[in-house]
Amino acid sequence: MEEKMNIAVFAGSFDPLTIGHYDIVTRATSFFDEVIVLVNSNVSKHSLFSVDARVRMAQAAFSSMDCIRVESFDGLTVSFLDRVGARFLIRGI
């Protein structure tokens, strides 16, 4: 029987990605098999950087860590969790 991966999602606008975001994600890697940094698109919110630019910044920040991937999504976070089979949502303070 195949063991399920523990996948966690850390969702946010990351406009821009901060050292605090980076710290939360890297700490989460010790608890989960995979951490997905989910860059949300909110058209009603004015962004400093485009979604593509924010994704590229996050990909560059986490490029040396194989257990972290970066994606963008413009729907509900819970829909993304279902789509990727994630059971955990990481929250910062």
Short names for language-model regions:
Residues M1-I93:
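Nucleotidyltransferase catalytic core that binds NTPs
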